[in-house]
Amino acid sequence: YLSAQALRAARIVVDIGMHLGFKDFDGKVWNAESSRKLLNEQALLDEEHSRSETDRYLGWPGQAISYKVGERVWMKAREDAKARLGSEFSLKKFHTYALKIGPMGLDPFAAELANWDGN
């Protein structure tokens, strides 16, 4: 769990750093080399995976941060449903319902999940 969170955090740093021209930890503008270095050292990726991740974020600006925002909305909706439904909450039913909703923006998605009755 923690290693996955470290990777997600590193992806956000890389994505934002490379696309907004921020300085890396060595005081240089973020580039593919500094991205791979961070992913190797902080997210513990091997060279092949750090290269692949770097290419991914060079070609898909904003993907890392949008993924993390979506994850937070999903997790909050799930925690709210657990609190609202108590012992009636079913993780499997929650996920089934959430996936059946289909694609939509995060605000309508959160509102839809807030109205879920557990069935």
Language model feature labels by segment:
Residues 1-119:
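N-terminal maturation segment of proteins
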